[in-house]
């Protein structure tokens, strides 16, 4: 329901499919994706793919960590698809705690942690996800002004230790 307030003059409907769907995310997409066994659509596109005989919705996206994938999988197929990606494509599977450590080491913000409705994306480290060529999004004028005049007041920083490297493992 909260998406409706961000929808401006679009002819669309929303459906909560979370009961029967699981989302799998792939970060640090390797350059060679032939081992996946399916073709990736262009970045920014959604496609229906078959993974190990199971139909999935796939979003190929760009993010602050580089190219990535989001897979929507029927909940009954999720474990098999995850196993396939781990064994066939050689992708390591990590839990929530390991992922949180990975993103914090790289100063990557997350919704519910560093990002919320009151968060300025340029101050949170999510500026790379803002497209300044696109039209009309909520807060666009404020963000564009901060960017144009280089007036960002805060940025994530490392208090100690050495950088982990962008998208590294």
Predicted regions and their residues:
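Basic, glycine/lysine-rich polyanion-binding surfaces/domains
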Residues: 1-169
């Amino acid at each position: 329901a909260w998406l409706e307030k961000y929808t401006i003059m679009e002819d669309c409907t929303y459906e909560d499919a979370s009961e029967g769907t699981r989302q799998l995310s792939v970060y640090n997409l390797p350059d060679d994706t032939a081992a996946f066994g399916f073709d990736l659509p262009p970045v920014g596109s959604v496609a229906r793919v078959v993974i190990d005989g199971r139909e999935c919705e796939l979003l190929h996206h760009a993010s602050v960590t580089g190219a990535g994938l989001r897979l929507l999988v029927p909940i009954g197929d999720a474990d098999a698809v995850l196993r396939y990606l781990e064994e066939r494509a050689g992708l390591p599977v990590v839990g929530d705690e390991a992922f949180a450590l990975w993103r914090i080491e790289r100063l990557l913000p997350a919704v519910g942690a560093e990002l919320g409705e009151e968060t300025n994306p340029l101050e949170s480290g999510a500026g790379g996800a803002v497209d300044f060529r696109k039209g009309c999004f909520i807060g666009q004028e404020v963000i564009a002004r901060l960017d144009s005049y280089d007036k960002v007041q805060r940025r994530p920083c490392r208090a100690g230790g050495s950088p982990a490297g962008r998208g590294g493992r």
